[in-house]
């Protein structure tokens, strides 16, 4: 709950992030729509809260959900963020009967553009999936914006320590992530899964977590011949089992 003296009024619950609920709200002074990400003190450590806040305030790119302010409530803290009226890419995939190839490619280009910027800042997102991609509407089309940097890590931190704990979502994780190994192309592997899902309507692998682990580690990716050849090649390269055989940078995949 917000304080009585708050600068914002909550309108509705619009989503659930990894570390808290997300509300649509209005800034009382300007009337602008914003998103408030609730971070409950008892559910989120100060270090985790400060980590995401630090990443958000230092990142400034059109295809990243950025931080506008910090708001305090009763036993809660809120990050004030860009409002993305199109919802999540997951909802879009679930509710859209068909997504054009052009729209699919545009969304992936948006995601890669945001990752290129984040990677240049030394940040690996580590949890690229449709639930963490928010959409804005623009000229009868959609633009994609990467959200939820809650488990992101600086490359220099990953190089200097063994990363355990929250590591991502099994359906979108690169094989080496299951062993606690990360690089920039782990994020690109997740983009490859999203691209596959956009153009085929399904993920390349499905099942329970243990089945997903086995599939990512050893099962070949099959792509319908209906998918254009150049796109099949791009998907195949992004989903190689060995990191060295994948795209090494977002710029290369672009």
Protein language model features and the residues they cover:
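Protein kinase glycine-rich loop
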Residues: 11-17, 22
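AlphaC helix of the eukaryotic protein kinase fold
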Residues: 40-58
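Activation-segment/catalytic-loop signature of the eukaryotic protein kinase fold
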Residues: 70
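Conserved short submotifs of the Hanks-type protein kinase catalytic core
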Residues: 74-88, 92
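Activation segment signature within eukaryotic-like protein kinase domains
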Residues: 107-108
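Protein kinase catalytic-loop region centered on the HRD/HxD motif
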Residues: 113-123
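C-terminal lobe helix-coil module of Hanks-type protein kinase domains
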Residues: 171-254
């Amino acid at each position: 709950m917000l304080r009585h003296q708050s600068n914002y009024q909550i309108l509705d619950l619009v989503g659930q992030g990894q570390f808290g609920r997300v509300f649509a709200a209005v800034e009382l002074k300007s009337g602008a729509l914003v998103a408030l990400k609730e971070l409950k003190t008892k559910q989120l450590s100060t270090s985790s809260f400060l980590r995401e806040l630090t990443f958000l305030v230092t990142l400034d790119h059109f295809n990243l959900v950025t931080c506008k302010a910090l708001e305090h409530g009763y036993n809660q803290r809120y990050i004030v963020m860009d409002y993305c009226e199109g919802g999540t890419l997951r909802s879009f995939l679930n509710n859209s009967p068909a997504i054009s190839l052009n729209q699919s490619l545009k969304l992936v280009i948006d995601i890669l553009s945001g990752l290129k910027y984040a990677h240049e800042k030394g940040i690996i997102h580590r949890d690229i999936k449709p639930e963490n991609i928010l959409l804005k509407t623009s000229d009868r089309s959609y633009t994609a914006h990467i959200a939820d940097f809650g488990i992101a890590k600086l490359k220099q931190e990953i190089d200097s320590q063994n990363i355990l704990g929250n590591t991502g979502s099994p359906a979108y994780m690169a094989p080496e992530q299951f062993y606690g190994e990360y690089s920039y192309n782990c994020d690109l592997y997740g983009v490859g899964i999203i691209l596959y899902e956009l153009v085929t309507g399904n993920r390349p692998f499905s099942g329970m977590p243990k089945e997903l682990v086995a599939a990512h580690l050893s099962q070949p990716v099959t792509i319908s011949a209906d998918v254009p050849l150049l796109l099949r090649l791009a998907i195949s390269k992004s989903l190689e089992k060995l990191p060295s055989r994948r795209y090494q940078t977002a710029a290369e995949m672009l």
